[in-house]
Curated annotation (Swiss-Prot):
Signal peptide residue numbers: none
GO annotations of cellular component type: chloroplast
Keywords: Chloroplast, mRNA processing, Plastid, RNA-binding, tRNA processing
Originating organism: Chimaphila umbellata (Pipsissewa)
Protein's recorded name: Maturase K
Length: 504
């Protein structure tokens, strides 16, 4: 509060304009409280508290607004046009600050920012987790041999009211909801939220973090019907009397849903389906035949047209035959190898335990695309030699180490499912050497002398830090699937993955 008072004293002429951000913070607190605490901030970790204090959320947002405001308070000169002003400040900066605040608030339940409160607690292992990007298991999970992959590119224009309705089920405070609607519409008047690109639509970079989150959560809510259909239809052909009543229940559900799913309900017979939405694409891998994949293609297109009024572009749907156990996924070629494994598994909830022998697929991420991504960020050369970025040399040594640690963590997150961590270790070593080179350039000494002065403590965090993934559950079932759907979630960091895959 003292920092706000000092800023207020420096800008007495616009004191009435500065009051509004202070009021806006209270709306942010209400949004964060209703979104993250009332709906689904419940950890599946022993010893962790199931509730968080609103004061902690207020301090987090208060720190965010303070830092952004202090960094940009004196950046506007007389060259700024009055036509691009909002509440006395530049619209570009003001809306960027607001949307960044909203993005952090809505990601609080999924973000790894609360991991510090779980130190020393046992965390749930990442087995059979799903992401907000996919209602089905990840391609990196354990699955039998897949034959085909379906690549669908469907435009996703998003109406503003749809985004507001996505948050409506979270927010109990009506004033906060109206405030969010106001900023969304004001942003549309200031700059379009979606920009045409390659016969599709992609969010502008300034707002992609918030709107990708809202869009993926919105689609994920509707896609929960997939879980029910695949869960029940996977054992329809069973002759066991134990599931007779369950089959009757499922047939009654089919009669209710027959108006919307007439000719496509029988497609859900193959339980080995893996699906993900990423960068405007929908990827579906299956063990089925080409005929089955064609019918899945028809279903997904029909689903998008019925629920989201999206019409796919011609030649934007491809069915590729998988060969050599490889799949072009997330910007790099993700290879897998077979490991026989005897498991006692339960594929989905409400399904029966099965003892079967499957082949475990371990993801092998090549080192070349990772080095290419580091090279694009000027952290390494194309030959994997560490390089000191000129921009990092002007920053503090702690900031350079933190940036390199973030790059290493992003590489480790992408290769989390890999059996051999040689590729991730090489990428982490390149990032660590780049941080040391940048710090040595700043102090104008050699890298050897810099490491000798500080010891190996600088590089320990790159190799000794354990996997940090934030796990939680949905205690309240999705409104489209009743009480049958409750899954653990792993939130895929969109920004980090976009940077790692070097996506334009």
């Amino acid at each position: 509060m003292e920092e706000f008072k000092r800023n207020l004293e420096l800008d007495r002429s616009q004191x009435h304009d500065f009051i509004y951000p202070l009021i806006f913070q209270e709306y942010i607190y209400a949004l964060a409280h209703d979104c993250s605490l009332n709906r689904f901030l419940f950890f599946e970790n022993p010893g962790x508290d199931n509730k968080x204090s609103l004061l902690i959320v207020k301090r987090l947002i208060n720190h965010l607004i303070t830092q952004i405001y202090q960094q940009n308070h004196f950046l506007f000169s007389a060259n700024d046009s009055n036509q691009n002003q909002f509440m006395g400040y530049n619209k570009n900066w003001y809306f960027x600050m607001i949307f960044e605040g909203f993005a952090i608030v809505v990601e609080i339940p999924f973000s790894x920012q609360l991991l510090s409160s779980l130190e020393g607690k046992e965390r749930v292992k990442s087995h059979n987790l799903r992401s907000i990007h996919s209602i089905f298991p990840f391609l990196e999970d354990k699955f039998p041999h897949l034959n085909y992959v379906l690549d669908i590119l469907i435009p996703h224009p998003v109406h503003l009211e749809i985004l507001v309705q996505t948050l409506r089920i979270w927010i109990k405070d009506v004033s906060s909801l109206h405030l969010l609607r106001f900023f969304l519409h004001e942003s549309r008047n200031w700059n379009s939220l979606t920009t045409p690109k390659k016969s599709s639509f992609s969010f502008s970079k300034x707002n992609e973090r918030l709107f990708f989150f809202l869009y993926n959560f919105h689609v994920c809510e509707y896609e929960s019907i997939f879980v029910f259909l695949r869960n029940q239809s996977s054992h329809l052909r069973s002759i066991s009397s134990e599931i007779f009543l369950e089959r009757i229940f499922f047939y009654r559900k089919i009669e209710v849903s027959s108006k919307d799913f007439k000719a496509i309900l029988w497609l859900f017979k193959d339980p080995f389906l893996h699906y993900i939405r990423y960068q405007g694409k929908s990827l579906l891998a299956s063990k089925g035949t080409l005929v089955l994949m064609n019918k899945w293609k028809y279903y997904f297109v029909t689903f998008s047209q019925c629920y989201f009024y999206m019409w796919s572009q011609p030649r934007k749907i491809n069915i590729n035959l998988l060969s050599n156990h490889s799949l072009d996924f997330m910007g790099y070629l993700s290879s897998v190898r077979l490991n026989p494994l005897m498991v006692r598994s339960q594929m989905l909830e409400n399904a029966f335990l099965i003892r079967n022998a499957i082949k475990k697929f371990d993801t092998l991420v090549p080192i070349t695309p990772m080095i290419g991504s580091l090279s694009x960020x000027x952290x390494x050369x194309x030959x994997x030699x560490x390089x000191x970025x000129x921009x990092x040399x002007x920053x503090x040594x702690x900031x350079x180490x933190x940036x390199x640690x973030x790059x290493x963590x992003x590489x480790x997150x992408x290769x989390x499912x890999x059996x051999x961590x040689x590729x991730x270790x090489x990428x982490x070593x390149x990032x660590x050497x780049x941080x040391x080179x940048x710090x040595x350039r700043k102090h104008k000494i050699t890298v050897r002398a810099f490491l000798k002065k500080l010891g190996v403590g600088l590089l320990e965090e790159f190799f000794t830090e354990e996997e940090q993934v934030f796990y939680l559950t949905l205690p309240k079932a999705s409104y489209t699937s009743g009480k049958l759907y409750r899954r653990r979630i792993w939130y895929l960091d969109i920004i980090c993955i976009n940077d790692l895959s070097n996506h334009e």
